Amino acid sequence: MDIIKNIEIAKVAARLAGKNLKDNYNSLNVTQLEEGRDIKLKADLESEKLIIEYISNESDYPILGEETGKSNLDLEDIFWVVDPLDGTANYNRGIPISAVSIALVENNNPVIGVIYDFNTDELYEGSVSSKAMMNDKPIFVSDIKDKSRGTLVTGLPVAMNYDEKNMQTLINNFQAWKKVRMIGSAAIASIYVASGKAELYTESGTNLWDVAAGVAICRAAGGHAVISNLSNDFSLDIEISNNLI
């Protein structure tokens, strides 16, 4: 595998998609499907189409996209994972916390990650053989060791059970931290940890395309990432930390 070549492929694809999402906001911010707490926009579909078209012309690896999907049988040991618009609900409401997220996965382990925050024009990258960077400048996780001084970033999955027991567990966990943030984008949450803005991002019942790129970037920044309970439909639990807390 040519790590450098594939990082460049992901970077170009992410920038193309991000530019389109920003430049054509009014025409792309059109609801295609709204189901419960989930929403799909024209932006999701058009962004994924653009990314898949570019990557397919540059790489032979199969692609797992959030919108188009793939079954386990269609994928190989190495495959791309694409979230064309992470933070769709934020994008829909004009909240500038969303990103394009692209990863290359080998044996279910993210080896390359690229996240493009098109709202701030910040491109984050990292791999198993390179340092984590933001716009070509090195980034590192924080050195905070205590939750009482740290920031937790988390989210409430679309399918979460809001019963009393689950909510009490959530509250008990929150109380240990100095600050807790819910920002509506797994990609942005993970780069907050990778760049030292937060110490832990954790979420249950999220998906591989939400976190794969962030896992690669955070590890390259000196952090620790654990994917657990990965299912056949690519749902999973995630914990991304500064490796100290």
Stretch-by-stretch model annotation:
Residues 62, 178-179, 224:
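Conserved beta-strand segments of alpha/beta enzyme cores
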Residues 78-120:
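Glycine-rich active-site/cofactor-binding loop and its immediate structural neighborhood
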Residues 17, 21, 44, 55, ...:
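Residue-level signal for inorganic ion chemistry
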Residues 103-190, 234-245:
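Acidic beta-strand-loop-alpha-helix segment within the catalytic core
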Residues 62, 112, 151, 199-200:
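Short, Asp-centered acidic motifs that coordinate Mg2+ and/or phosphate
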Residues 1-14, 18-19, 167-175, 188-245:
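Oxyanion/phosphate-interacting regions
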Residues 1-85:
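N-terminal subdomain of lithium-sensitive/metallo-dependent phosphomonoesterases centered on the IMPase/IPPase/PAP
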